């Protein structure tokens, strides 16, 4: 789904941070200032946003996985909702150090979480003592909170989408170490350096965050849908219809 400049304006994408907190590396994306607040150039944002969404669309069409990361209060619910809608992994609580760089260990925790969920589902947790069941439930809830969003990721993601680069420095460093491309919303108080696909704009407003996350989810779904259509089209080209004329029928 395409996003218009009007929608960006209504969501407050153009409102940056206070001018005294600005990062000079964001200068190319700044239009000016109003009441000591930097105003982001939405023409630049539109171009960069579309470039980022095209990348996500192609990635999804090629069955790629994009990890959505938004752990600050106003982003959590939005990120988990939109990632779930697109069938993509997400981190909406605290980023655990080593989530990518030490994924082998994280996989062990995922295995443990799945085992415990299976115990609840098949009722075997009820065979534990009251104390053991309580401890197991607490452990499961803790694991769900920290890694529930990535339990079906399988392996390292092909890309990562981040809301607020300053808030997620560890996640970004890990992705960079592993050569995982990063799509990120960068506000006027942060540096766009090291980000593969920069979306210059407000990273605090929940309406702006919803616009970005919905855009990523839509791009994923569009990419997958297009890939499916291509498969169907390729299949129909190979299909030859055989008509029965009934000439071989016996009386």
UniProtKB/Swiss-Prot annotation:
Biological processes, Gene Ontology terms: translation
Keywords, in A-Z order: Ribonucleoprotein, Ribosomal protein
Pfam family, one: Ribosomal_S2
Gene Ontology MF terms: structural constituent of ribosome
Keyword Transport: no
Record PROSITE patterns: RIBOSOMAL_S2_1
Keyword Ribonucleoprotein: yes
InterPro entries: Ribosomal_uS2 (IPR001865), Ribosomal_uS2_bac/mit/plastid (IPR005706), Ribosomal_uS2_CS (IPR018130), Ribosomal_uS2_flav_dom_sf (IPR023591)
Assigned GO CC terms: cytosolic small ribosomal subunit
Similarity remark: Belongs to the universal ribosomal protein uS2 family.
HAMAP family on file: Ribosomal_uS2_B
Protein name: Small ribosomal subunit protein uS2
Organism: Aromatoleum aromaticum (strain DSM 19018 / LMG 30748 / EbN1)
Gene encoding the protein: rpsB
